[in-house]
Amino acid sequence: MDPLGAPSQFVDVDTLVSWGDSYEDEVNSSDSTAEAFQEDSNRSPFLYNRDINGKVVLWKGDVALLNCTAIVNTSNESLTDKNPVSESIFMLAGPDLKEDLQKLKGCRTGEAKLTKGFNLAARFIIHTVGPKYKSRYRTAAESSLYSCYRNVLQLAKEQSMSSVGFCVINSAKRGYPLEDATHIALRTVRRFLEIHGETIEKVVFAISELEEATYQKLLPLYFPRSLKEESQSLPSLPADIGNAEGEPVVPERQIRISEKPGASEDHEEDEDEGLGVDLSFIGSHAFARMEGDIDKQRKLILQGQLSEAALQKQHQRNYNRWLCQARSEDLSDIASLKALYQTGVDNCGRTVMVVVGRNIPVTLIDMDKALLYFIHVMDHIAVKEYVLVYFHTLTSEYNHLDSDFLKKLYDVVDIKYKRNLKAVYFVHPTFRSKVSTWFFTTFSVSGLKDKIHHVDSLQQLFSAISPEQIDFPPFVLEYDARENGPYFASYPPSPDL
């Protein structure tokens, strides 16, 4: 995999000793202890797993020197940060990397974006932006750092990468405590390998001397190399080990188990009120949790007596099931359609999401998988204000989403999708589509009606979103130039669409 003439300092990941092979202990001489521990029900949530340990490498060195499928670069939102990791990567990759980065239009905190490796031994570079840490916003920082690691791994999975070299994403200048950040990094990688381990052969943690002691201390907690080490590490695990995917769990947003199961219903209602409005984490924990009497809930629904808060919790649990499935299922066939993607920001600084109607072959794809892909892409986008640009350009009857599917999507998604959606720009509508949209937003989802804006030309769209902030499919530009004049034909389309 080395490029022609690669410098000799590059290190092939296949030559590195795995975490599992680095363990020196009298495992064979303590079979009775191991067997006894296997029978003990008090096992660690991170079980001893020889196969997973064989995929993990702890290596003290420069991540830019790794010969693997992709390495990770930690940077800032404009991808111009000057830190030791980035500077080494830029120096070895050559000037072409800077030119490629300019096409990405930056990267938000927690996101991951891909470029070629150019003169590196690694074929690709995955760029991500770690959070700035402030103790008062600790929860937000934890969630953002989790997203960095998760999105890097998800991108590696989607691109069928066999090996990934991680730098330490939480750079010192952003102030994230090293030990706290390492817990998140290790458990996120561990959970990902548990679920998607068949897609990745090697994950390397490239660390410096300053970070080595922390990683050596915490790795056994999440990647125990024997049953004995698993047992010894159990007391050192933190109270919050995240949900089934390692994502941080906010305690006040969990469904709490009453200390007195026989308490009155009034007491239970008081606790429900204490949950607050934001229930986005309910049901996402990896471990079993006590819920109310299901039969009683169904009876109350039929009688119209179930409270609004209870209905909201029920909806949140349903959404979390969809989200969990979206994160675990292979959706590469839907992603390859390039029908939904993130581009720049509008004039108010809100994220712009693009939907290309002509790229949706409704009769040829599994629409449930399309819904899963929408949730997979939009879940982290919808936490902030955003707008949708829908290109209806040159669609046929085989591209039109029926009202039942749209109603199902609207009913399934979390409340944040609806609350933070500020506008839908319906580009190049037809008379029929305008009528259909009016009926749908009037009788099915009335809350969406005031957010729909029909846009007959790209010039109208540019009054809300500058042309540099949108990646246009070429056929959209050609159609608009033909229908509304050649002014827009000079604006270059995205080469990937």
UniProtKB/Swiss-Prot annotation:
PROSITE patterns attached to this UniProt entry: MACRO
Gene3D superfamilies for the chain: CRAL-TRIO lipid binding domain, Leucine Aminopeptidase, subunit E, domain 1
Entries under CDD domains matching the protein: Macro_GDAP2-like, SEC14
CRAL-TRIO domain segment(s): 333-481
GO biological process, one term: response to retinoic acid
Domain of life: Eukaryota
Record's keyword terms, sorted: Phosphoprotein
Matches recorded under Pfam families: CRAL_TRIO_2, Macro
Residues annotated with Phosphoserine modification: 280
InterPro entries documented for this protein: CRAL-TRIO_dom (IPR001251), CRAL-TRIO_dom_sf (IPR036865), Macro_dom (IPR002589), Macro_dom-like (IPR043472), Macro_GDAP2 (IPR035793)
Residue span, Macro domain: 43-223
Similarity comment: Belongs to the GDAP2 family.
Protein name: Ganglioside-induced differentiation-associated-protein 2
